[in-house]
Amino acid sequence: MKFLFQMDDPQKININEDSTYMLIRESLRRGIECYYNDPSWVFSEINKVNKIKSHVLSLKLNKNNKLSYQKMNLKEIDLEKMNAIFIRQDPPFDLNYISNTYLLDRLKKPLLVNNPKEIRNFPEKHIMMNFPELT
């Protein structure tokens, strides 16, 4: 199995508090290949409709239980070869962020954890407007 975690830099997360770290750690423990990508690394391959690719880095746990990767090992993959993509980055809700959700929307095969369409349509700062009784 192969999981991709689209997230903020994994080497900068707090391993005692971050739920994404816990997902990755458990996935690695179970023998699942885990990869990291930055949203800006996702692209559509020219002249190939629906070929959405990304540059990725393989994630490992070092001896201190921190996530590590080697930037020189950046490789390109077809995102439909992943079993699941976890969209976990903190949103700067800007055009790059929106464009990334549209590209990920085009994928047919992998399980998308945090649906890009719903992320785009219901930004966390606005979702509370749907529940005024809770504010």
Regions found by a protein language model. Give the residues of each.
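Extreme N-terminal starter segment of soluble prokaryotic enzymes
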Residues: M1-L4
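Conserved N-proximal alpha/beta basic substrate-recognition cap immediately N-terminal to
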Residues: Q11-T135
